[in-house]
Amino acid sequence: VTTTHAAELPAGMQQFDAQMERVRKQFDVPGIAVAIVKDGQVLLERGYGVRETGKPAPVQADTLFAIASNTKAFTAASLSILADEGKLSLDDKVIDHLPWFRMSDPYVSGEMRIRDLLAHRSGLSLGAGDLLFWPTTSYTTEEVVQRLAKVPLKGGFRDRYAYDNILYAVAQKVIEQVSGQSYAAFLQQRIFAPVGMRGTRFNADHLQPGDNAAVGHAKYDFTKLRTVAPLTWSNNSGAGGIYSSAHDMALWMNVQLAGGILPDGKPLFSAKRQHEMWSMITPIPIDEVHVPELAAARPNFAGYGEGWSLSDYRGHRMVWHTGGWPGMVSRLTLLPDQKLGVVVLTNQEVGAAFNAVTFQVLDAFLQVPPTDWTAAYAKLVEKADSDAGVSWKKHQDARAAHSTPSLPLRSYATTYRDPWYGDVVIRQDGKRLRLQFAKTAQLVGTLEHWQHDSFIVRWDDRSLNADAFVNFSLTPDGALREMRMEPISPLTDFSFDFQDLVLTPVPTETAAGK
């Protein structure tokens, strides 16, 4: 436990420790780490709860958490460093640095700029291609980027916002090509070391024996909180690989709030580049407020820059990002005009916890009448759970439960191939069918008949919370035409982009040849 400059915390923070315990209890969070910086000083860095449920080791300021997509700002900063050195421009075409780079549309392949890789406006749909690396797959980063050529575009190029991860793998390859270093080495030498982030690790594979690291937790079947196996994002670390601590992220926030100036007074990146990273490229539609108590958090504008989300809060520009990972979620928030930053790292999957803490801290420093953010976000969680229940009941009500499959079970047992993911195999195991994603060890489960030629895959790993409908269509002659999938629950993480797969049966001799 570490606290500095506690006397400078505002009056609204006097009961902060008790409020943190309330957040942990309300949202069933084993452990939280928080850091707050103001005017270049670290006012608070502290851990609450435990690294792993059922074990006594406490969360501390230097406990490592997966920061997931908070990594994207490091990728943008890396490109900024190279731009400041004149080794690239964010306006360069990607193919000028990676001649083999391809999207599914030749025009987009040729026109994609490095800045476009960061701004979520490529025409890819939400989370498109994420199954190439989520959950852990055996593909390499190079294979992920090469398979991007087969991922279909669902929107117009630079037309609208749709968050993706896969283009940050391309950004990682650009950094490696231009710098001549691995991305792990570049981050360590050019960012982690100069900033002073001594405990930070490039990804889960770089965790060392004895590291003070949190363990992720998920609610199995959306109910029972248990530990989860660590994810390895070694094949897309540019999008979300980094493990860091509240202590190290406080240093990172201070460099950001200082306009890129390092503790030794030297620039990590130029003020010009920071201005561009923090400038809106892609506008984001603003959602309606579904819980009245959250009205104060609704922004007047929202958009995305280079590795950063941009919006406003109570009249102040807010630069922020969240990170989502199996078993861990986080949020980093900056109010540049206040020289204020707060990071919240948690070892569970409910973003309500980090939002409640963040807005509570911001309100205390802005000295506005307090909102009970814990209660407000509890209502949002309750509504999301209720909506998921309504969705499931609609499926149940529409089900023709006494219908039967068109074909004998053995006829569905074959290898199916999607142009970008690759193979999904169905095998008959006695009286049941088993489904396996060939490159994803965790995606193995049992098919349960739902209705007609629709099944549900129940994954063996119940921490995934990603059971999916599996729908078969037939040719006029009664042969299998294709298999499509879609997540059942609206609570399933968007990175399980099953709906983007178009799986067709592979002729037996072709499958055998593979």
Walk through the language-model features, giving the residues of each:
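Active/ligand-binding-proximal structured segments within catalytic/core domains
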Residues: 75
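Catalytic loop of the DD-peptidase/beta-lactamase superfamily, centered on the K-T-G motif
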Residues: 7-45, 176-189, 193, 227-514
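Mid-domain, small-residue-enriched loop/turn segments at the edges of structured enzyme/sensor domains
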Residues: 113, 166-167
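Active-site helix/loop module of the DD-peptidase/beta-lactamase fold
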Residues: 31, 53, 58-61, 66-70, ...
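Short, conserved catalytic-motif segment at the N-terminal edge
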Residues: 7-67, 87-89, 96-97, 103-104, ...
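Short, solvent-exposed loop/turn and secondary-structure capping segments
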Residues: 45-48, 127-133, 188, 201-206, ...
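Cytochrome P450
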Residues: 159-163
